[in-house]
Design a protein with these regions (language model features):
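Sec-dependent N-terminal signal peptides
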Residues: 4-15
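Structural detector for short beta-strands of small beta-barrel domains
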Residues: 26-55
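Extended, hydrophilic extramembrane loops/domains of integral membrane proteins
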Residues: 79-120
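Sec/Tat signal peptide C-region and signal peptidase I cleavage site
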Residues: 16-20
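Hydrophobic alpha-helical transmembrane segments of multipass membrane transporters and ion channels
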Residues: 152, 205-210, 248, 252, ...
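Hydrophobic alpha-helical transmembrane segments of membrane transport and translocation systems
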Residues: 295-298, 307-381
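Helical hairpin unit composed of two closely spaced alpha helices linked by a short loop
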Residues: 256-264, 270-316
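Transmembrane alpha-helical segments that form the functional core of multipass membrane systems
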Residues: 127-234, 241-254
Length: 381
């Protein structure tokens, strides 16, 4: 997920300067094409006379201004799967349309290149399956979860990214967006009540701690913010951005989901315990919340570490062929490890903070009994 957001952020950076700096340049959108035929030819490689394979691809444009146009496009296969686009007949591809003249009116005014295989249809299918299962299993809560997911994505794309691109502090921007996302998500799913308010306060304070610890980790570990090649591309497009700040922001956003989950679990537990026995004191409710929180700490911290470990599995496999001292001191390795640890530390803060806030707010609201089982009857505490 973190890499996806980085790539999308890079696209924002590449698009915005073009629109601002050159209003006369013709910029054409990418289009969809269909591979109708492929012929294979041997070709001279670019490196030391190595032999490579060339696919002479017949592509038909399926969308846009030049729909129906057919082109022969050379597709080089070097044997490196990281860069090769190995096509087969019937594949749908993304086409990059490059204008040759200041005005574009006919297919002869453009060059057409194969940018990549089209994968968005598969993404749409799995998204639809996910939403359908969410509605089928979650019922009403599933519907509110979908709304919260969409709202969070909108906050990231239309609030966080523009704020960073326009020079706002990435850390403050990430904390602000994280708090807004928390408010929307928890109130939508849990209703307006003291339980939800407790979870929001616990998450918000923990996010601030995550921001502070991320700054400390980056400063003392001398992290550069350049942990992958996408960061180098971003630097080429926008060298004015704070890459250490962007790294800290990514740590904060990555920890957000686990923090919300932890806070909601603790607040819900404290609320259920109090509903069972209303004679319990704030201290007793706090202790109950801490007991549950201690169980949550292990699983949620493990979840964060496994997420980072899974996304960096090739990097982990690299450790078998490199000195361990050198491996753990690599910038990319240190970045991934510290990111997981920052999220885990934030969870540790989230447990006692949410427990004490929930114990106090839920006990305080006992004068007005709130039925938490019926969200439509909830009132703002």
């Amino acid at each position: 997920m973190k890499k996806i957001l980085t790539i999308l952020f890079l696209l924002f950076c590449l698009v915005l300067p073009v629109k601002a700096d050159d209003n006369t340049k013709v910029v054409l959108p990418s289009e969809t094409g269909l591979v109708e035929n492929i012929k294979y030819e041997d070709a001279q490689g670019l490196n030391q006379g190595e032999e490579t394979t060339k696919q002479v691809v017949t592509v038909k444009v399926l969308t846009g201004k030049f729909k129906g146009t057919e082109r022969l496009i050379d597709n080089m296969l070097t044997g490196n799967p990281a860069y090769d686009i190995n096509l087969t007949k019937g594949d749908k591809v993304v086409l990059h349309i490059e204008p040759l003249n200041d005005t574009v009116s006919t297919p002869d005014d453009v060059d057409i290149f194969i940018a990549d295989i089209q994968r968005d249809n598969q993404i749409y299918v799995f998204t639809a399956v996910f939403f359908a299962l969410l509605l089928f299993i979650g019922k009403k809560k599933g519907g509110t979860s979908i709304v919260s997911i969409i709202s969070t994505m909108c906050l990231i794309f239309f609030v966080l990214m523009p704020m960073i691109l326009h020079g706002f502090c990435p850390i403050a921007s990430a904390v602000l967006v994280g708090i807004l996302s928390t408010i929307i998500t928890i109130y939508l799913v849990g209703g307006f009540n003291s339980k939800s308010s407790s979870a929001i306060i616990g998450t918000a304070i923990s996010l601030i701690f995550a921001g502070g610890f991320s700054m400390l980790a980056i400063y003392f570990a001398h992290l550069t913010g350049f942990a992958g090649e996408e960061n180098m591309f971003l630097y080429t497009a926008r060298p004015d951005l704070s890459f250490t700040g962007i790294l800290a922001a990514s740590m904060i956003i990555a920890a957000l989901g686990a923090l919300m989950d932890t806070a909601v679990s603790i607040a819900s537990t404290v609320n259920e315990i109090y509903e069972t026995d209303k004679t319990l004191t704030v201290k007793q409710l706090f202790n109950s919340g801490m007991n549950v929180g201690r169980d949550i700490i292990g699983t949620m911290s493990n979840t964060l570490i496994l997420v980072y470990l899974g996304s960096s599995l090739p990097l982990v496999l690299l450790s078998s062929n490199i000195d361990m001292n050198k491996f753990f001191n690599l910038n990319q390795v240190a970045t991934e490890i510290l990111s997981a640890l920052i999220g885990s530390i934030a969870i540790l803060f989230c447990v006692p903070i949410t427990a004490i806030v929930a114990a106090y707010l839920i006990k305080k609201s006992s004068g007005n009994k709130v039925d938490f089982s019926e969200l439509e009857k909830n009132e703002i505490s």
